[in-house]
């Protein structure tokens, strides 16, 4: 796509050209719902973009035409084996779907059993768009906004989508859109911000070599999340050394991206961003704290480098503001944290309406890479590369339609019904139902 800097080669693009490069997508994309009260047109001086975004939000995501008869949810179970979680849903007609839960359910499973389970029983799964809206109202669940409800809710949604896909003989990607990407090109995500430059580089080189990655994201800044020491700081000067060193080490053909996880002030974010621009990085993720929306916009205005955000964002209207006000150029909803693929697709389609692109944040562990792949397969405004944290998992399963291997930086998306994999019954049998 002309005008888009993928982190490879010279960067001549400014933000307006970046937005223009993705223009034209908006006319092709239908969309899903939020409550009518939440999308009602406001004052006359309201940003005119909101009317367009609100119209997009009113359109459904789930391709309901695949289902001519009700699919009534009869049972919804959360299963646990040690620190592993599965979700199993069954319809009155005997259809079944399964999902793999995020490790965060170790702390959040009571929200599944108390706040979500009662709501979904007896509902028609074909109404999934509306269910994902109204579940926030039930029991004042919106008070649990963010990962606390998003992660359990996504676990429910993934299982329902797996069931619906098996009923219709369609992949999850086909249920939430048209297939645009039968293969997903990935970038290797790395961490190591607390380590020295030398040690970080060796670990990053190891990670890149393991999957022969063609694209890479590094961490910059000194967000010391891994310690209780309130005085802890990262290695001095690490960012200033890492940014040019990574480019020099991997060359101009490697697409590079950077993530600060909200570490910087506006001034320091712009300073770091200028260095990223100099060394041709493709985007700058979370330059300031995710909920500093005005400050994020200030950083975006101070750089030509695209700003990416969304891992921590929990609100559809939060994304709505960021998009309408050009605070970001790339949306990154996390399919787990944000409450599933349908809500995430709403974000992607809002972004597409204004020439912005989407690359989801990927939660590691479980089968997070599979949920990422199905979501990306249906993205009309997908970025060229998508986050990848490896294929390692404790889940025992079989996939008949994809080798699930990284070849030339790409992974083939499974084409079987639902998630496209069958979880080993012997593995499932190790799990016990979690009771309320």
Can you describe what each PLM-predicted range is?
Residues 94, 156, 169, 259, ...:
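Conserved, mostly hydrophobic/aromatic
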Residues 118, 123, 130, 134, ...:
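Shared catalytic-loop signature of beta/alpha-barrel
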Residues 85-93:
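Short beta-strand elements
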Residues 32-79, 96:
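C-terminal segment of N-terminal export signals and the immediately downstream linker at the start
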Residues 5-26:
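N-terminal secretory signal peptides and thylakoid transit peptides that target proteins
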Residues 50, 96-168:
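Metal- or metallocofactor-binding catalytic centers and their adjacent structured scaffolds
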Residues 157-195:
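Glycine-rich, aromatic-flanked loop segments that form ligand/cofactor-binding clefts
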Residues 183-298:
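Metal-dependent enolase-superfamily TIM-barrel catalytic cores that perform enediolate-based chemistry
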């Amino acid at each position: 796509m002309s005008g888009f800097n993928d982190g490879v080669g010279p960067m001549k693009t400014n933000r307006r050209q970046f937005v223009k490069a993705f223009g034209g997508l908006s006319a092709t994309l239908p969309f899903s719902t939020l409550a009518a009260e939440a999308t009602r047109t406001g004052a006359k001086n309201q940003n005119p973009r909101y009317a367009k975004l609100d119209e997009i939000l009113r359109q459904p995501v789930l391709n309901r035409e695949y289902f001519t008869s009700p699919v009534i949810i009869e049972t919804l179970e959360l299963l646990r084996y040690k620190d592993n979680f599965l979700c199993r849903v069954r319809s009155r007609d005997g259809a079944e779907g399964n999902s793999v839960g995020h490790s965060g359910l170790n702390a959040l499973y009571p929200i599944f059993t108390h706040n979500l389970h009662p709501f979904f029983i007896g509902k028609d799964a074909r109404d999934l768009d509306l269910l994902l809206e109204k579940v926030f109202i039930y029991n004042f669940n919106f008070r649990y906004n963010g990962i606390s409800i998003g992660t359990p809710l996504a676990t429910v949604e993934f299982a329902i989508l797996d069931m619906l896909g098996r009923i219709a003989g369609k992949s999850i990607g086909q249920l939430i859109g048209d297939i645009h990407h039968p293969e997903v090109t990935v970038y290797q995500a790395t961490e190591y911000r607390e380590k020295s430059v030398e040690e970080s580089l060796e670990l990053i080189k190891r990670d890149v070599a393991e999957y022969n990655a063609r694209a890479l994201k590094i961490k910059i800044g000194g967000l010391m999340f891994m310690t209780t020491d309130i005085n802890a700081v990262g290695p001095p000067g690490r960012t200033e050394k890492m940014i040019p060193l990574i480019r020099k080490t991997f060359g101009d053909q490697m697409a590079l991206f950077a993530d600060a996880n909200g570490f910087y002030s506006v001034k320091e974010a712009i300073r770091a961003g200028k260095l990223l621009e100099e060394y041709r990085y493709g985007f700058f993720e979370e330059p300031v704290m995710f909920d500093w929306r005005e400050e994020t916009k200030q950083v975006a205005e101070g750089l030509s480098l695209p700003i990416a955000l969304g891992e921590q964002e929990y609100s559809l209207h939060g994304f709505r503001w960021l998009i309408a006000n050009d605070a970001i150029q790339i949306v990154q909803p996390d399919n787990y944290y944000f409450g599933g693929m349908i809500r995430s697709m709403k974000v992607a389609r809002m972004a597409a309406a204004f020439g912005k692109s989407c690359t989801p944040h990927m939660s590691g562990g479980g089968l997070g890479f599979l949920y990422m792949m199905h979501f990306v397969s249906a993205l009309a405004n997908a970025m060229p590369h998508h986050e990848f944290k490896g294929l390692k998992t404790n889940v025992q399963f079989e996939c008949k339609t994809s080798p699930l291997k990284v070849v030339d930086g790409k992974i083939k998306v499974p084409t079987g019904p639902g998630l496209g994999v069958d979880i080993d019954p012997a593995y499932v049998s190790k799990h016990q139902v979690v009771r309320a």
